[in-house]
């Protein structure tokens, strides 16, 4: 049970430790099955976004034909199911294999959210990237989260070191995601290089921390003018924090700066 709780991802919308757990005869391995059903309802008086999530970039201009004066919506597609296998071996120490999905696919179909394994500080699989801070995201009813925050999932191989007291250091090699404005002459190409990330985090109590993160990337595109592939460098810097002023008052915040990281930020 302690491993189940300690390895929970620190995001408000992530499910807690499972209620149903199966263990082997020796008690070295445990498989947890869990999830939740979540329904939200909202009413918009001023015509915001024709989407169950709030994305400021989708707000139509005043006078636009897409602008709705009033709008009522309900959604249950963020309901989540997950499987979590935890255990301990001599070679791997404590390990976790985790997979989760909700119904956010096209037509509310089942969609993968996380699928990864962690052992000896390594994370291998599909999960949240290193250039973001789950613990610095405030609790929100809206599933998309706060505007301007770094938020993305990616296939990765990352390593987190927490052997120093109060400190965590992380590095990662991640599958890139490139998006941008194209035209008849320019198209997004297959990518040649992974994204490289690094982070350092200092914790001064269980609910307070300061994190610095960076990302370096190469973005490849094709031009029909010279029939060649070109690359542009991108980078990002992030400072984030969360700390408790009182036992019931938690402060969250983050600042992001960079070039070519727009697809990793909530808009």
Predicted features and spans:
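Cleavable N-terminal export/targeting peptides
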Residues: 1-11
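Intrinsically disordered, low-complexity segments enriched in polar/charged residues with Gly/Pro
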Residues: 8-9, 110, 146, 187, ...
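Short linear interaction motifs
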Residues: 10-20
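General secondary-structure edge motif
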Residues: 15-16, 61-62, 139-140, 233
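Outer membrane beta-barrel
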Residues: 23-53, 63-179, 192, 197, ...
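Solvent-exposed loop segments that connect transmembrane elements
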Residues: 56-62, 179-191, 220-229, 263-267
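Detector for outer-membrane/organellar transmembrane beta-barrel domains
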Residues: 203-267
């Amino acid at each position: 049970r302690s491993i189940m709780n300690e390895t929970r991802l620190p995001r408000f919308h992530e499910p807690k430790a499972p209620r149903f757990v199966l263990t082997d005869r020796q008690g070295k391995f445990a498989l947890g099955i869990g999830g939740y059903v979540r329904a939200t309802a909202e009413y918009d008086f001023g015509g915001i976004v024709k989407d169950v999530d709030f994305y400021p970039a989708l707000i139509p201009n005043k006078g636009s034909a897409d602008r709705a004066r009033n709008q009522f919506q309900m959604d249950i597609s963020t309901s989540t199911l997950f499987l979590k296998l935890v255990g301990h071996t001599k070679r791997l120490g404590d390990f976790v294999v985790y997979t989760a999905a909700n119904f956010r696919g096209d037509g509310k179909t089942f969609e993968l959210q996380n699928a990864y394994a962690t052992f000896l500080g390594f994370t291998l699989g599909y999960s949240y990237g290193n250039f973001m801070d789950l613990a610095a995201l405030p609790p929100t009813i809206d599933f998309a989260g706060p505007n301007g925050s770094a938020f993305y999932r990616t296939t990765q191989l990352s390593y987190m070191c927490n052997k120093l007291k109060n400190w965590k250091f992380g590095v990662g090699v991640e599958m890139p995601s490139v998006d941008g404005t194209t035209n008849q002459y320019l198209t997004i190409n297959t990518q040649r290089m992974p994204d490289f990330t690094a982070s350092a985090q200092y914790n001064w109590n269980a609910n307070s921390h300061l994190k610095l993160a960076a990302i370096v990337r190469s973005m490849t595109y094709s031009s029909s003018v010279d029939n060649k592939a070109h690359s542009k460098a991108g980078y990002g810097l992030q400072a984030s924090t969360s700390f408790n002023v009182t036992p019931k008052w938690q402060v969250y915040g983050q600042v992001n700066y960079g070039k070519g990281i727009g697809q990793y930020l909530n808009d």
